[in-house]
Amino acid sequence: MIRQRLDEALVARQLYPSRARARDAILRGTILVDSEPARKPSQMVLQDAVLTTADEAQKYVSRSALKLIHALGHFNINPESRTCLDIGASTGGFTQVLLQRGAEHVFAIDVGHGQMMLEGPRITLHEGLNARDLKLEHISEDVSLILCDVSFIPLHIALPSALDLVKSGTDLIALIKPQFEVGRQGVTRGGMVKDETAHARVCAEVAAFLVGNNWSVYGTIPSPMDGGDGNIEFLIAAKKN
């Protein structure tokens, strides 16, 4: 009987939209093969194998939703009735969580186009907008919660405009991606940052950047899952003084 890689089988059966999402689910231990936990994405499975998933990420347009849910719980930040700014909104994983948790409105911005998978009267989408070019005319003075998940740009470049525009008491949750913070010299050929010392240094530098911009840092925690490329990520939360 024909065998197939597990990650390919999950996509072929339309349980996941891509091998990357399937691989992530397997590595997080959410996939069963004939009632047994899956071992690895390359595991070979029979065509008639029973594949089941108990993956919370499937409820959302992006797995990043689980990262925000973890941070909201850990830092005890409630989006209910708040106006939020989602920087690097992409498909809308963070925005979806905010709306489900009662956010009054979400201003979603992304430098790309055509990625957002959500729509509705509580979302204002600004596509093709670089976070560095953010102005008050793009959002509202009522924003009291900033979320940030950006790639290919360090936070000290992506965040200043947003940090300056909002009022005292505004909360921030940002995803720290070391591979975009350390510079080329700190990244391996495969784009990985595995050095724990580098992780600690990056988190400390982001925290110092926020403090230097008149924000008080609640803390920094590991993300509950790695990035799509396998890099370890962190979540930082802060409040504007």
For each of these PLM feature ranges, what is it?
Residues 169-183:
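Conserved beta-strand signature within the Rossmann-like core of class I S-adenosyl-L-methionine
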